[in-house]
């Protein structure tokens, strides 16, 4: 038992190390820490971001470490959120980004603005906020550059992003639960287009994916079979419009909110072609 506790303690220390190294005002010369460092877990995150903590918890929040840095009369808050995995970190990033601005190549993705910067790398999401009285883009850029160097691990965005057809694609986000408002689709990527939306959910196995698809088919009473991937159905729903949902191995995907099921099926077939086989 003593060995187990020691192992868990060592694991926690190793896990927290990158966050502690990034939450450091000395990343950039001329900046000093103001006040005490911040650390929050799932049990008390609401004390720091009351009203929005649930959004982080849904993505698999583990812990947060942060500091307030000061240089002269200027200040920057640096907060490092550790998530359960890299996809979850990317999900939090896309939930917080400015959709009107492009995603920059920082880690798996980032944005640097005059008063705010954010990026994700591996299982960490980093958010910086400058004094709102004055833009500090140069300082934010310097902090982001040094912070990104101190986080090891994955710098590539989730592979699923490349599966969605790019024509007239507006955005792609990781939805932590109830994809398309359907509880059976617990977590997945949703792509918004000028017309309609697509999704991909990754199940544990082809068998579990088949079970989910079967339940979805029963939910849409007038569903008809469709020739897409391993199995599929199409339907015309009151809320989701023309739709087609398919299974390819352990992946469930499809298109919804199309003018009719035929159009949805054609788009779903294009999506299925880009999803890797098992």
PLM feature segments, named:
Residues 1-2:
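N-terminal secretory signal peptides that target proteins for export/translocation
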Residues 16-23:
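Boundary at the C-terminal end of the N-terminal hydrophobic targeting segment
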Residues 25-59, 83-122, 158-192, 202-246:
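Short Gly/Thr-rich strand-loop-strand
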Residues 57, 62-72, 155, 186, ...:
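Long, contiguous binding/interaction regions
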């Amino acid at each position: 038992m003593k060995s187990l506790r020691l192992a868990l303690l060592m694991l926690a220390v190793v896990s927290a190390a990158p966050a502690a190294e990034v939450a450091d005002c000395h990343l950039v010369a001329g900046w000093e820490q103001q006040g005490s460092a911040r650390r929050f877990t799932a049990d008390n995150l609401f004390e720091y971001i009351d009203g929005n903590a649930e959004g982080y918890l849904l993505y698999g929040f583990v812990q947060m470490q942060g500091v307030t840095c000061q240089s002269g009369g200027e200040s920057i808050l640096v907060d490092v959120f550790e998530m359960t995995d890299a996809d979850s970190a990317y999900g939090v990033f896309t939930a917080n980004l400015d959709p009107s601005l492009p995603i920059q190549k920082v880690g798996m993705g980032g944005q640097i603005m005059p008063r705010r910067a954010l990026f994700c790398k591996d299982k960490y999401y980093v958010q910086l906020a400058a004094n709102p009285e004055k833009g500090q883009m140069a300082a934010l850029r310097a902090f982001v550059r040094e912070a990104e160097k101190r986080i090891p691990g994955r710098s590539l965005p989730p592979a699923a992003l490349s599966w969605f057809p790019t024509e007239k694609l507006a955005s792609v986000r990781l939805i932590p639960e109830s994809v398309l408002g359907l509880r059976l689709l617990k977590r997945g990527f949703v792509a918004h287009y000028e017309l309609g939306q697509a999704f991909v959910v990754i199940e544990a196995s082809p068998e579990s994916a088949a079970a989910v698809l079967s339940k979805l088919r029963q939910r849409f009473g007038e569903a008809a079979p469709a020739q897409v991937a391993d199995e599929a159905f199409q339907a015309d729903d009151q809320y989701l419009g023309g739709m087609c949902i398919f299974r390819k191995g352990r992946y469930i995907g499809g298109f919804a909110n199309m003018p009719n099921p035929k159009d949805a099926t054609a788009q779903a077939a294009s999506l299925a072609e880009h999803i890797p086989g098992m």
